[in-house]
Structures are given as structure tokens and as C-alpha cells.
Amino acid sequence: ICPRILMPCSSDSDCLAECICLENGFCG
């Protein structure tokens, strides 16, 4: 489950839990 928090990212490793880095530059 990915927490619904807007987090800027450049790669999946910047994101929490099962989130991935989306094309818009945020985790999701």
C-alpha cells in the first residue's frame, strides 16, 4: 500500500513503502 502523500522523487527509491516514482515527478 502506498501512503497518499505528495512526495517529489527522481527514482522509486525516493518513495515510501510500495510507492513508485510516477512520470509527474511525484511518488504514487
Curated annotation (Swiss-Prot):
<feature type="disulfide bond">
    <location>
        <begin position="9"/>
        <end position="21"/>
    </location>
</feature>
<feature type="disulfide bond">
    <location>
        <begin position="2"/>
        <end position="19"/>
    </location>
</feature>
<comment type="function">
    <text>Inhibits trypsin.</text>
</comment>
<dbReference type="InterPro" id="IPR000737">
    <property type="entry name" value="Prot_inh_squash"/>
</dbReference>
<dbReference type="Pfam" id="PF00299">
    <property type="entry name" value="Squash"/>
</dbReference>
<keyword id="KW-0646">Protease inhibitor</keyword>
<comment type="similarity">
    <text>Belongs to the protease inhibitor I7 (squash-type serine protease inhibitor) family.</text>
</comment>
<dbReference type="GO" id="GO:0004867">
    <property type="term" value="F:serine-type endopeptidase inhibitor activity"/>
</dbReference>
<keyword id="KW-0964">Secreted</keyword>
<dbReference type="GO" id="GO:0005576">
    <property type="term" value="C:extracellular region"/>
</dbReference>
<keyword id="KW-0722">Serine protease inhibitor</keyword>
<protein>
    <recommendedName>
        <fullName>Trypsin inhibitor 4</fullName>
    </recommendedName>
</protein>
<dbReference type="InterPro" id="IPR011052">
    <property type="entry name" value="Proteinase_amylase_inhib_sf"/>
</dbReference>
<feature type="site" description="Reactive bond">
    <location>
        <begin position="4"/>
        <end position="5"/>
    </location>
</feature>
<keyword id="KW-0960">Knottin</keyword>
<keyword id="KW-1015">Disulfide bond</keyword>
<feature type="disulfide bond">
    <location>
        <begin position="15"/>
        <end position="27"/>
    </location>
</feature>
